[in-house]
């Protein structure tokens, strides 16, 4: 019993649970994060990130409940590769059980982490799935963590250079932090590995349009709409592209349609507001031009 109470997962496997990754509440907007996770509810990312959000919101019981329900969904998604995908989840449960006083279960989960934690036997090397999970968490939780996300995706790619998931994550992180060529180059690589990813297609279209490659950008946008017509994240970026190209009515129609499915999406509301603002400015400019022309007449 004494040995059980002296065990503390926060010091023994800090690289494999989110609660020890220095995710500070002051660095993030919890309400906005909650909306983002709701928008992405069809993917596994909310499943992995929601427990930390619930804990930061002062709801540890919900955090533990979500984690306890996660294993089956992860196994359904990843099949025989799910053990490596479960390392961080088991680490989260070990930490949470310990801090809620369930030392026996905490140690059981910690032992599961130990079974898979280091692929080479070296404590300096983790599985790419752990680096990837850490990177996605940093990318999702706060803009101030995006450079940490880049570092973690790079570590995952060192071990699995052709993994489409790590290339996609690295692409998104670069897109949000690098202004020009590095992100564009990585977007192209990620799409070579996963050519049917509507989100990446929309991101690359925005980059190409910024470099005046309008025909190629337009083609990518239409393909993104064909592949992901109801994905709020894809439509948000497509709507942004259309607004920048002056297609305000089409942008508004798409954004309003997807808004009916994700009514709390901050990003879609923001893009709609920008569209209406631009329409108002266009109307004002036309009126000013008409008044000026009448003055000349």
Predicted regions and their residues:
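Non-TPR docking regions that flank or precede TPR/alpha-solenoid scaffolds in eukaryotic proteins
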Residues: 1-297
